[in-house]
Every structure is written in C-alpha cells, then in structure tokens.
Amino acid sequence: MKRQALAAIIASMFALAACGGEPAAQTPAASAEAASSAAQTAAETPAGELPVIDAVTTHAPEVPPAIDRDYPAKVRVKMETVEKTMKMDDGVEYRYWTFDGDVPGRMIRVREGDTVEVEFSNNPSSTVPHNVDFHAATGQGGGAAATFTAPGRTSTFSFKALQPGLYIYHCAVAPVGMHIANGMYGLILVEPKEGLPKVDKEFYIVQGDFYTKGKKGAQGLQPFDMDKAIAEQPEYVVFNGHVGAIAGDNALKAKAGETVRMYVGNGGPNLVSSFHVIGEIFDKVYVEGGKLINENVQSTIVPAGGSAIVEFKVDIPGSYTLVDHSIFRAFNKGALGQLKVEGAENPEIMTQKLSDTAYAGNGAAPAASAPAASAPAASAPAKSDY
C-alpha cells in the first residue's frame, strides 16, 4: 500500500498534462481600480484618522495583490476558525482545524506602519476555543489572549505592523502543538514602505507535518496521534495541507523567462524544512523572511514557525519539483510540489540527452550481456525520481 501511494505521488509529479490552479495575475485595470479606490478612501478620511481598508486575503497558493499606496491605513482582517474533515491523501481523510476552511489559512498582506484590526470568529460547530498568535505583532502573546474565542463567539483586537517581513500566524490555545499539528497556521506579509520589487508570478506555500494514528496511506478517517507528535515522528510532511496540493492538476505554472517569487512558510509544529526547487538556483533568498538577502542559494532553511522568501528566474521550460530536501520526507511522506514552466527550449543553458553508449568500466573488456533483470514492483519511474 505504501509503495502504491508513493507511486501515485511521484507519477503525479511527472504527468505532462496541462495543469490548472494558476494564481490569477492582477491586471493593470484591476490594479488601477484598487489604487483609485484607496486614494478615494484616503481623501475622504478626516484629518488625523487612518483610512479604513478591508484586507484582500487569498487561499494558497494564490497571493494578495501588492500594496499600491504610500500611506498607512487601518486594515480590517476577518478570520474564522473552522474544524472540518478533508482529504489528506487518496483514500485518507483527516479532521483538520483551520483558519478560514483550509490549510494554510488565508495569506494576509499589509504595509509597514498599518494598523491591523482583526475580527476573529470561532464557528459555532467548533469543539474547542481557538485564537491566533501573529508573529508580526509586537506585544505579549502576539494577540493570543485578545483573540481567545469560544465556539460561536467573535473577538476583535488590533496591532500595529511595525517591522516589515514575512511572518507566521498560528493558533496558540493549549495544547498549542495539537492545534498547530491539526493545520492552524498561515502567513502575513508586512511589505516595507517602499514595497517589494515587481515579479511576474507569486505563490504562497506552507509546509506542515501531520501525525495520524494510521501509517501513511492507511485508509479512512485518521485521528490525530499525540504520542507520535511528541516523538516528532510524522506520517505526513506536506505542502499546503494535503498530499499533491501543488502537484499534478494543482501544479504551479509559469513561463520561461519569468521571475517567480515564492512566499514559503513552515507551520511545523516540529520539523525544520530544507526547501529546494530541483533544477533551479534561488537568485535571492530573504533569509527567514526578513531584510537580509542571500544570493545564489541551492536550498534554504525554513524553521518551524518561520518563513523565507525565494526568487528565481525560470530560464527554460520543464517540470520543476519542489521538495523538502530532507529527502525521505519528499518521496516517502508527501513533501512534493511542482512548478510547470512552458516555453522554448534553450540548449545553450541545458540540452536533452545527447548520447547513450555502452560502458565497460575502466578500460576492461565488455562483459557478456546478461538477461535483463525484471523490474521490481517499485513506485518510481525507471529513468529518474525527478
């Protein structure tokens, strides 16, 4: 069963069919409309008060549009915690605890200096209280006490986004690890006042480790296993909450020549991610989601409860595999994604296979040919795991 599950994962990575799920790009018209609306809001705001703006938030892998204003605002963010059963893998379901109905929660994008007002609701069907700790907030608990909310209740609090960067938010109700392990995390981007450089495509990706009673691939609804979580022995390590969430039909898409920016988080609760895109080198990495930029990076560490921003230009077409390069997590536990790039081949950068000839090894006489061994009932394609 485990081999069959792995086969399904890897097969999806190399499917050549066209993929959906591409985040919608903001058009110039939409950007101009948003800018005009924001300008009108600012003009109508009484002196000494911040204009009030409703946040545009997005489910992964989509990213909210860039901030298109040069002044601070009060940004209103609505969040709802929902406990729901969803697919973890083929034939496998899990009772997730979520922000806004999915894992990760919606991505939030604000500007340095904004006041973020959070309206936090806990769905009446929830079985326990929930809250949110914003790593972007300065103050005890990151808002956890202010947002502690029973089922069927709504709490409101605000914080000022003092420092730019990419930050995790997560539930912090005891037992904290259990709430996070069930999927309660997401990212908030605090753009610097001057904004970020423009790129062609942006994607939102968060890794998480999940602890089920049954082993990976065990069918049916799988409950949370606290003993495995304490021992840090996950059955699943995945991007965006589910096996195959950004692979196969859900693959990310770009075109050759485009610059891609990925906002990468790690909800944990336990494992550190070694994030890597097979066949690419990160031109820039905003280390741990902060101001420091590293260049020409092959893999970057994303700590549990942390983040990184990676940028790279895709020069040639192909299927680029996203992995946690603690590699058994990728090919055996689900930490696989896919970026499909269309465009013209460029043999100056890389060719296809040019030849395939016999080799006897160190000048020795060629060995007599032997009958071909039968292929094992394995899961990976014969030619490559990539």
UniProtKB/Swiss-Prot annotation:
First and last residue of the signal peptide: 1-18
Residues that hold Cu cation 2 according to the record: H135, H170, H325
Sequence repeats: 367-371, 372-376, 377-381
Pfam families in UniProt: Cu-oxidase_3
Residue positions binding substrate: H135, H276
Subcellular localization(s) per the UniProt record: Cell outer membrane
Cofactor: how bound: Binds 1 Cu(+) ion.
Domain Plastocyanin-like: residue ranges: 97-191, 241-342
Membrane topology designation: Lipid-anchor
Region (3 X 5 AA tandem repeats of A-A-S-A-P): 367-381
Lipidation (N-palmitoyl cysteine): C19
Cofactor(s) the protein requires to work: Cu(+); Cu(2+)
Coiled-coil segments: none
GO cellular component: cell outer membrane
Function: Catalyzes the reduction of nitrite to nitric oxide (NO). It could be essential for growth and survival in oxygen-depleted environments.
PANTHER family xref list: FI03373P-RELATED, MULTI-COPPER OXIDASE
Similarity comment text for this entry: Belongs to the multicopper oxidase family.
Descriptive protein name: Copper-containing nitrite reductase
Source species of the chain: Neisseria meningitidis serogroup A / serotype 4A (strain DSM 15465 / Z2491)
